[in-house]
């Protein structure tokens, strides 16, 4: 646990250092390119929560969508932590007015079922509590 905290502290210090350097020069530099990381990683889950919140907010569908499967998760370090996510999402039984869709069941009626493949890139600065959608590309499957 101590090793994990040391690594996390080092990462935060490095990102902050790079962040200041990038702000000085005006263009983010890639400190570490995208690498595969575990789907269960806390920041992947946080980025995915944000991506789905933004997807549902922008969608014209009457129902919320929720993640069915995470196909790929990667992290890149620039002036922030960037998460590349490939996911399958599906329409739930919860209408948007219901709010939170964490516990919503997926549509069972064949006429209402809808599955979508999405690629999201989310920028995160956890030390500033900032999240930003850099890319959202989705298509029906």
Curated annotation (Swiss-Prot):
It comes from the Eukaryota. Coiled coil: none annotated. It comes from Mus musculus (Mouse). It is found in: Secreted; Cytoplasm. Expressed exclusively in testis. Found in spermatagonia, spermatocytes, round spermatids, elongating spermatids and spermatozoa. The record marks 26 as: Reactive site. The keyword Disulfide bond applies. May perform a specialized role during sperm development and maturation. The gene is Cst13. The lineage of its organism: Eukaryota, Metazoa, Chordata, Craniata, Vertebrata. Belongs to the cystatin family. GO terms for molecular function: cysteine-type endopeptidase inhibitor activity. Disulfide bonds join 94-104, 118-138. InterPro entries: Cystatin_dom, Cystatin_sf, Sperm_Mat_Cystatin. Residues 76-80 are annotated as: Secondary area of contact. Its main location: secreted. Residues 1-24 form the signal peptide. Pfam families: Cystatin (PF00031). Keywords: Cytoplasm, Disulfide bond, Protease inhibitor, Secreted, Signal, Thiol protease inhibitor. GO terms for cellular component: cytoplasm; extracellular region. This is Cystatin-13.
């Amino acid at each position: 646990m101590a090793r994990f905290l040391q690594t996390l502290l080092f990462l935060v210090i490095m990102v902050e250092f790079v962040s200041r350097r990038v702000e000085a020069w005006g263009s983010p530099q890639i400190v570490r390119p995208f690498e595969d990381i575990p789907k269960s990683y806390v920041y992947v889950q946080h980025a995915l929560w944000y991506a789905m919140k933004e997807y549902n907010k922008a969608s014209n569908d009457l129902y919320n969508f929720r993640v069915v499967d995470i196909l790929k998760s990667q992290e890149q370090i620039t002036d922030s932590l960037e998460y590349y996510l490939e996911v399958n999402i599906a329409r739930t039984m919860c209408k948007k007015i219901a709010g939170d869709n964490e516990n919503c069941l997926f549509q069972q009626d064949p006429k209402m079922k809808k599955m979508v493949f999405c690629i999201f890139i989310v920028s995160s600065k956890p030390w500033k509590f900032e999240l930003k959608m850099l890319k959202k590309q989705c298509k029906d499957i």
